[in-house]
Amino acid sequence: TAVIGRGLEADGYRVSVLAQPDWHSAEAFSAFGRPRLGVLIGAGNLDSMVAHYTAAKKRRSEDFYSPGKRAGLRPDRATIVYANRAREAFGADMPIIIGGLEASLRRFAHYDYWEDKVRRSILFDSGADMLVYGMGEYAEREIARRLKKKIPVSEMRDIAGTAYLTAEPDKCAFPAVELPSVAQVRDNKRLYAEATRTEYAEHDPIRGR
């Protein structure tokens, strides 16, 4: 968050950081007023479910990524909760971009240990317009540059390191590999394993698709 924020500041943008806001209502998300360009959301340095629960699914008493190791300052599935509260606060026309470790690892259909099921991409449940995965410095600055030019997120389809939902996969700006559907990987463990293998094989930033 700090690195990306400083990068945006270096480009001349004003950045407000709302750390661990009260997620019980949308009011806290309006603390700095309405953003001019958009809202960037991250869940922290660790997946919120890993931070909150042990491998035995017991609630942790401490959160090492919160002030004073105090637990309970972030919600479960923080990216989804924060994105939905931001949408509630600012409306359907506000660009909402999610990123960070939690979003990056959940951008595809994925097995969720705590629910013991395969969940769909976090883009669906968060309602975000776009997901930035990996380190994100270049992508976030490029997104901000285009938003400043009034280019809608729906037209940003050629920024490396981003993911989005579309009903027109044939219009992808890059060579693509089609993975099995969520329904298929939920019902077939072999297809799930093959999809995961393909995802990892295509991570290479030079030759990956």
Which role fits each region the language model picked out?
Residues 2-3, 81:
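Short amphipathic alpha-helical face segments that pack within enzyme cores
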Residues 3-15:
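Short helix-loop-beta junction
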Residues 19-209:
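Glycine-rich beta-alpha loop elements in corrinoid/cobalamin-binding modules
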